[in-house]
Amino acid sequence: MSSKKYELDAAAFEDKPESHSDAEMTPQKPQRRQSVLSKAVSEHDERATGPATDLLPPSKGLTTEEAEELLKKYGRNELPEKKTPSWLIYVRGLWGPMPAALWIAIIIEFALENWPDGAILFAIQIANATIGWYETIKAGDAVAALKNSLKPTATVYRDSKWQQIDAAVLVPGDLVKLASGSAVPADCSINEGVIDVDEAALTGESLPVTMGPEHMPKMGSNVVRGEVEGTVQYTGSLTFFGKTAALLQSVESDLGNIHVILRRVMFSLCAISFMLCMCCFIYLLARFYETFRHALQFAVVVLVVSIPIALEIVVTTTLAVGSKHLSKHKIIVTKLSAIEMMSGVNMLCSDKTGTLTLNKMEIQEQCFTFEEGNDLKSTLVLAALAAKWREPPRDALDTMVLGAADLDECDNYQQLNFVPFDPTTKRTAATLVDRRSGEKFDVTKGAPHVILQMVYNQDEINDEVVDIIDSLAARGVRCLSVAKTDQQGRWHMAGILTFLDPPRPDTKDTIRRSKEYGVDVKMITGDHLLIAKEMCRMLDLDPNILTADKLPQIKDANDLPEDLGEKYGDMMLSVGGFAQVFPEHKFMIVETLRQRGYTCAMTGDGVNDAPALKRADVGIAVHGATDAARAAADMVLTEPGLSVVVEAMLVSREVFQRMLSFLTYRISATLQLVCFFFIACFSLTPKAYGSVDPHFQFFHLPVLMFMLITLLNDGCLMTIGYDHVIPSERPQKWNLPVVFVSASILAAVACGSSLMLLWIGLEGYSSQYYENSWFHRLGLAQLPQGKLVTMMYLKISISDFLTLFSSRTGGHFFFYMPPSPILFCGAIISLLVSTMAASFWHKSRPDNVLTEGLAWGQTNAEKLLPLWVWIYCIVWWFVQDVVKVLAHICMDAVDLFGCVSDASGSGPIKPYSDDMKVNGFEPVKKPAEKSTEKALNSSVSSASHKALEGLREDTHSPIEEASPVNVYVSRDQK
């Protein structure tokens, strides 16, 4: 038997807790609580079913001129969207903690009439804002490109002809065609005729609704059967989509976590730098009797250089590069900060249909036959004979059967009569004659218990068939019975076919990988409890499932209690998923998990998912999601399946690692600079070593050298977004105390080595101490003042770049992971520029500080001074790296600031206990024994029979999945 499976769109079979009636747009459900969408639904339906005078009469089409006038009046048929003006983005780049500090420095420099220095600072400020603006605009353009590529179209009658146009330019009064397979482009009234409309994306109900002139198909729904002409009544913000978008604004979005982290880092570094610089300022005035002007200039320059001016630019660039990388994995990021949040996700709430499953119904090779000679192939042929096999399928069930059967074999029979599906009889029937033998017979297919009532040997096979139906129902399997008459006209049960929407081939492995990466997966579905249990079994998820009636009942989804996590968190964590839930339950589940301390991602596709998507830390609109879901989501998938989400997590963790290494480096560089000049100002002063230059009583660098360090470092750091990283195996969580400790260790070694070199240089510069200095021991001439300044500039510059390579590998040695070529080349170029500048600096007095190139000199030893500085820096770089690794080992050993225990986010998941019993929920503690299986089957028998009765009427059943058993079982084999 071939292992081939036959596919069918599973959306037509998806089950939800309740269904529409043909006459109601939004039926009342006694257990359903008012959701954040209910207000929009009720208002829209009151308007749609109100007096006829409220609606436009049936349209006969518009002209282009009329449509243009109406477009000016009503606006474009698009969801309302808030867009920040480009100029405002640029202005925001000129304000904030970092820009504000730089503005203060610029004002002070100009006030002191230091025009060149002020101009340099001003240029840095403008460059900072421009690059930040460019990266933000570029990221926004990527999102806009996605929206443009997904723009829906509409078939409209304009200028006396039918044409395809952008649905965004539809206006009230347009005549549109609503046909099977097309989306409803706006809120429309039906001129005449009847269509079946799928409103699952709007209401969460999967059963199609039959609509006529008294109904109004809504924008965002889909026509599944029929074709009519309709009149556009409402567009844009006046549609149900527009109402939903307005309601979503009530769910406030948290400020991106990365911005909170950056602000904390900025304020911490600014506070430290400001405090130390103020101490230097006061000390210089009191100790060296420096003028207010000179002391203030020194303090301001050190402050500006020490604070991370380009912090937001580098982070924005890194996130933008990450968004481009994600787009290659079929993931579009609508909010850059979502990448950082995604790296910390440790709880994923996933839809079932289409995400965990293929969303394609498949005939399985598990077939139960009741007569010798029958098998899956012959049963499928009989099922196809009970349909018009050479005509387009009449419904989803026929599509599946005809796609699986051998239609060439069916052509050996002539269909004399065909009775289509009748809701009363729950089956189809046909009379046929075999062209080869002339035998005449009847066939039928339908709900198993209906067919069972027809067969002549019902008493003989009744228990067997009921056991089969019950066992399949208990596993969430859908089934279809086929029967045939013999020469005496008696009905014989030919077989029972099984079909399901199976998991995607990679879903089970993807869930396993997710758990290995520290992410727990919860399935959230509106489907039947049995389906959810079977799906969890197939995917190795916890079979304990909560249904809607076991969840806490919340009256107002906009006013959730703050103790949900405390009361219900452990209960929700102890199950594998949730079944038969409504949109407001999804919202509540996400909020409970967030209160429990988890970073939660949520997948969804419909308008009803939008509030939960917005509430989640990371909302993910899956492939084929509605515009409303995309608008509420942080990420949009352009490829189906859960594996895409896992790829998003890994890429996001890579981005997080880049940001972590950058922040560690940036904090280290700031502490190194400010602490070096602070300590040098107090203890290692040229005045103490015999300096008589009034402008060289304490050690400092000219502003030009400071700015050169800043520009070269920031320019190189722009490439960190392209650096090689290895994603963490655990969810990433910002632990700023650990980051500051790691950065402080790097800074302490770099600062200590700089202070030591300054001490060596001052002794080599001093006439009093030269004889005992290292310069004298190495055979070097006494160090001039200008070369001392330039030497320290080169040392600080080299140490900064080497610290970058140490910070990027965390607790490993710097050679653990090679840098990317672009980062390496950027660092080499910057180091080369710094070395060349220090070597051949023209002897001058910028800011009255004497400077001189290190390579200028009479002897070869003097000309090789830059090389000696390089050797010194490299030796201390190795020391720095060893100290870093040892420090990380000690930090991990003592779990400093929870660097180990808090790595995965919210701690271990508690196993189920009796204390978790809420609303009667009890877990599946072990598989049922055979002695209890029959009782379980009988408990679901009546429910499964009732569901199977409606199999053909609504092309739906609450029994959906089956285990992939590729066998067929005959009665004799049993």
UniProtKB/Swiss-Prot annotation:
Its EC number is 7.1.2.1. Mg(2+) binds at residues 605, 609, 714. Residues 1-61, 950-974 are annotated as: Disordered. Residues 1-23, 950-959 have a biased composition (Basic and acidic residues). Keywords: ATP-binding, Hydrogen ion transport, Ion transport, Magnesium, Membrane, Metal-binding, Nucleotide-binding, Phosphoprotein, Translocase, Transmembrane, Transmembrane helix, Transport. GO terms for molecular function: ATP binding; ATP hydrolysis activity; metal ion binding; P-type proton-exporting transporter activity. PROSITE patterns: ATPASE_E1_E2. It comes from Leishmania donovani. It is found in: Membrane. Residues 113-117, 287-294, 652-661, 713-737, 841-868 are extracellular. Residues 1-92, 138-264, 322-630, 685-697, 762-812, 888-974 are cytoplasmic. One of its GO terms (biological process) is proton export across plasma membrane. The chain crosses the membrane at residues 93-112, 118-137, 265-286, 295-321, 631-651, 662-684, 698-712, 738-761, 813-840, 869-887. Belongs to the cation transport ATPase (P-type) (TC 3.A.3) family. Type IIIA subfamily. Its main location: membrane. It catalyses: ATP + H2O + H(+)(in) = ADP + phosphate + 2 H(+)(out). It is a multi-pass membrane protein. One of its GO terms (cellular component) is membrane. The keyword Ion transport applies. It comes from the Eukaryota. The active site is at residue 351. It holds the Pfam family Hydrolase. The gene is H1A. Gene3D superfamilies: Calcium-transporting ATPase, cytoplasmic domain N (3.40.1110.10), Calcium-transporting ATPase, cytoplasmic transduction domain A (2.70.150.10), Calcium-transporting ATPase, transmembrane domain (1.20.1110.10), HAD superfamily/HAD-like (3.40.50.1000). The keyword Translocase applies. This is Probable proton ATPase 1A.
